[in-house]
């Protein structure tokens, strides 16, 4: 009977081992790689890279930056003659000498866009001021002053070519020449 017990024990153990899949054998070969997983979140930002090499030099051009043209002049103490360029009595700035000081005529030496401005203070007179460009009026302003001093201003931007001329003409009318006073400032500069 003891043999039967041993035999039954062996059979029961064998069944238990077989139900669990049998005995563990040696490991098999590695399997094939699986599909890629889900993309993870981005990592932290890295440090900046080194500077790149210098680029190739650009084309050379002549810069007109050094070319300038500007003036400011003043007339005071006398009344200007009509239909003639105003002869200014004081030069406040004319470093490039583009305004001919004895005639009051500006001659363009550097082509480009110019701002021209004039301011007139008047008393006891009527004044008409014209900004002239090569004998054509491009801006005209009028003002009348009886007892109170008045002022008159004008500004215009003109594109000019080399050799073109610009000046002011002023016509002054008054019944009291001894009391009439006119002061004119005229400026121009290349933009």
UniProtKB/Swiss-Prot annotation:
Residues 26-39 have a biased composition (Pro residues). Residues 64-191 form the C1q domain. One of its GO terms (cellular component) is collagen trimer. Residues 22-61 are annotated as: Disordered. Residues 1-16 form the signal peptide. Coiled coil: none annotated. Its main location: secreted. InterPro entries: C1q_dom, Collagen/C1q_domain, Tumour_necrosis_fac-like_dom. Residues 22-58 form the Collagen-like domain. It is found in: Secreted. Keywords: Collagen, Secreted, Signal. This is Protein HP-20 homolog.
